[in-house]
Amino acid sequence: MKLSLSSPPYADAPVVVLISGLGGSGSYWLPQLAVLEQEYQVVCYDQRGTGNNPDTLAEDYSIAQMAAELHQALVAAGIERYAVVGHALGALVGMQLALDYPASVTMLVSVNGWLRINAHTRRCFQVRERLLYSGGAQAWVEAQPLFLYPADWMAARAPRLEAEDALALAHFQGKNNLLRRLNALKRADFSHHADRIRCPVQIICASDDLLVPTACSSELHAALPDSQKMVMPYGGHACNVTDPETFNALLLNGLASLLHHREAAL
């Protein structure tokens, strides 16, 4: 699996791995790259079955497989210890990595994540699946911003959204891969295992997220032994895109306080 690695800003700089959500594209993290690369070696990638890592996914594709293939790719690239920043599905992969490879994961950041899928989130995906079956890729892509962004943010950026739609349609991961990745997301359940995650965890959520209720992050915070939770008042599900200044400040402060503190203790 292909990875994109930035140059380390100094010798032995900590590694931060960015894992996007259901869309799977590493470019999702573009608003974070410049600030992170000043202090960390940053790893981005298109998830298997998407972008520049095309593949046909098995029907039983799982979050555990997503975690294993990423860890193997990191080890092959010479990276054995790393922090993980995951958005939604990416946060699930991050938790799986922390469970399966505890010696490797130094810290986890969960952005609008959850322990197991909330009934509201499941309902949103059911609506989106119906759109996919009835209207194909175009209907899925055109509906996607409604679940990602606040209404006023979208209204002020109509040309940008049109360009994003065209790009997403041109690089659509395919119906079968999308549904198999979505099914993996829906099957994931960390409610009985989260207390075994021992690395520090920063939880970031947005209070106006239409797709994932903030209660999901509260449940994560209660279940994870070494976690702290920050709530952004605005930004929607893709709060790192819509309000990068606020998000980046929270992320950088979290990495500095949790990751560096852990490294100093080792």
Swiss-Prot record:
Belongs to the AB hydrolase superfamily. Hydrolase RutD family. Its EC number is 3.5.1.-. It is an enzyme of class 3 (hydrolase). GO terms for molecular function: hydrolase activity, acting on carbon-nitrogen (but not peptide) bonds, in linear amides. It comes from the Bacteria. Gene3D superfamilies: alpha/beta hydrolase. Involved in pyrimidine catabolism. May facilitate the hydrolysis of carbamate, a reaction that can also occur spontaneously. GO terms for biological process: nitrogen utilization; uracil catabolic process. It catalyses: carbamate + 2 H(+) = NH4(+) + CO2. Disulfide bonds: none annotated. This is Putative carbamate hydrolase RutD. Keywords: Hydrolase. The gene is rutD. NCBIfam families: RutD. Residues 14-115 form the AB hydrolase-1 domain.
